[in-house]
From Swiss-Prot:
Disulphide-bonded residues: C194-C204, C312-C362
Species per Swiss-Prot/TrEMBL record: Serratia marcescens
Catalytic class of the enzyme: hydrolase
Alphabetical list of CDD domains matching this protein: ALP
List of residues binding Zn(2+) 1: D353, H357, H438
Binding site for Mg(2+): D77, D179, T181, Q346
Gene: phoA
Signal peptide: 1-23
Protein name per its UniProtKB record: Alkaline phosphatase
Similarity comment: Belongs to the alkaline phosphatase family.
Active site residues per record: S128
Co-factor binding comment: Binds 1 Mg(2+) ion.
GO cellular component: periplasmic space
Reactions performed catalytically: a phosphate monoester + H2O = an alcohol + phosphate
Subcellular compartments: Periplasm
Length: 475
């Protein structure tokens, strides 16, 4: 019997050692999927390589088609490939990488055109309203529309569908909560400009409560009743309802009467311990958009030639009382995960776009860094949870381009000193107006978790709706 026992013990030990070796190899390969820093000295052969080795096994191991209990969608508004690259160069260096944005293992590109309202033909440069409606509803629409198709017909949003399925829902943005990206999840209006009752009566009369419509974006936000809603836009809640049971009362008073928890600074946000349909959380941390992370000079004509390279500075207006996007994301996840049915959460870094419009490199770069930190929070939760799909993408591409440091560009330029100590010039040149414009270049979309493979290759922005809905197994 002793030899047999020895053989069995040896076989078990061999299996354990083999299992450990496979686990170690898988772990190392998994690390190779997330750590994308250059591996050595950039001047040496292979020094700029980002791959540690073959990643086939690790990619196979990352694939899963099980139902996702939770979905977290993170949007960089205006975050095209140029914006990602510029921010990475500045903050991490040419051989560095973002530990959130660059750490998702499965990556693709998607198209994001909208439709012309009259001809129904493609409009190759979308706005944030049409693009957010595309992933929120799976339907193409015209620029400016929120939650409606090209004919103005209401379309159910993913947040509404997830809520009806019993999931917790969250909506987080650094913009006004009435702005296009957050508004597309919770409202159905023919124009994105209809923030409150006053604008709606003037610009979206058919949507106004007094005309039998659903009401303004802010009124619909309250009625949709996500469990967690965080961002800016407090001033619109001061408007008075013009019709219905709340006529003559402010929307802030209406929120209180409907049981919302209202918080306005970082300490109050952290003190919240519960958010659900009985006590939904409404965090409003600015009258308008929330303050950006970094400040610096705007680009100007031949600014890279006439002015010295700059280093971005912290924005003194963003005090400790203002929660960061990462802090809002982390808190939203902590509150939403208590729902046994899971949750759907959208997070937007809004001012990449707004600072790109303003030709402000430091503002734009700082907001991209902010989004990356939020992505890191989402990924940390998803890795620990094992049942969460995380997707990172943008709504449209934008104006900024990286050009030669001393280029004589026809547009507006500014030179910055990157983490490498090297000069980098950003150029903005697609508009003679005060505001730079969007562009129609396809966008990066990356994912981690169950059903992440569905972002690989070329997809369309509307595919994102079906990918997220089907991953959660809801209809």
């Amino acid at each position: 019997m002793q030899p047999a026992v020895s053989l069995i013990a040896g076989a078990v030990l061999s299996a354990l050692l083999c299992s450990s070796a496979i686990a170690a190899e898988t772990s190392a390969n998994a690390d190779g999927l997330t750590d994308r820093a250059a591996r050595g000295n950039l001047v040496e052969p292979g020094g700029a390589r980002r791959l540690a080795g073959d990643q086939t096994t690790a990619l196979k191991a990352s694939l899963s088609d099980k139902t996702a209990k939770n979905v977290i969608l993170l949007i960089g508004d205006g975050m095209g490939d140029s914006e990602i690259t510029a921010a990475r160069n500045y903050a991490e260096g040419a051989g560095g990488y973002f530990k959130g944005i660059d750490a998702l293992p499965l990556t693709g590109q998607y198209t994001h055109y909208s439709l012309d309202r009259k001809t129904h033909k493609p409009d190759y440069v979308t706005d944030s309203a049409a693009s957010a409606t595309a992933w929120a509803t799976g339907v193409k629409t015209y620029n400016g529309a929120l939650g409606v198709d090209v004919n103005g017909k209401d379309q159910p949003t993913l947040l509404e569908i997830a809520k009806a399925a019993g999931k917790a829902t969250g909506n987080v943005s650094t913009a006004e909560l009435q702005d296009a990206t957050p508004a597309a999840l919770v409202s159905h209006v023919i124009s994105r400009k209809c923030y409150g009752p006053e604008e709606t009566s003037e610009k979206c009369a058919a949507n106004a409560l007094e005309n039998g419509g659903r009401g303004s974006i802010t009124e619909q936000l309250l009625k949709t009743r996500a469990d967690v809603t965080l961002g800016g836009g407090a001033k619109s809640f001061n408007q008075l309802a013009k019709s219905g049971e709340w006529q003559g009362k402010s929307l802030k008073d209406q929120a209180a009467a409907q049981g919302y928890q209202w918080v306005s600074n970082a300490d109050e946000l952290q003190a919240v311990t519960l958010a659900n349909q009985q006590k939904p959380l409404l965090g409003l941390f600015a009258d308008g958009n929330m303050p950006v992370r970094w400040l610096g000079p705007k680009a100007s004509y031949h600014g890279n030639l006439d002015k010295p390279a700059v280093t971005c500075e912290n924005n003194p207006a963003r005090t400790a009382a203002t929660p960061t996007l990462a802090a809002m994301t982390e808190k939203a996840i902590a509150l939403l995960k208590d729902n046994p049915n899971g949750f759907f959460l959208q997070v937007e870094g809004a001012s990449i776009d707004k600072q790109d419009h303003a030709a402000n490199p430091c503002g734009q770069i700082g907001e991209t860094v902010d989004l990356d930190e939020a992505v890191q929070k989402a990924l940390a939760f998803a890795r620990a949870d094992g049942n969460t799909l995380v997707i990172v993408t943008a709504d449209h591409a934008h104006a900024s381009q990286i050009v030669s440091a001393d280029a004589k560009a026809p547009g507006l330029t500014q030179k910055l000193t990157t983490k490498d100590g090297a000069p980098m010039t950003l150029s903005y040149g697609n508009s003679e107006e005060e505001s730079q414009g969007h562009t129609g270049t396809q966008l990066r979309v990356a994912a981690y978790g169950p059903h992440a493979a569905n972002v690989v290759g070329l997809t369309d922005q509307t595919d994102l709706f079906f990918t997220m809905r089907d991953a959660m197994g809801i209809k």
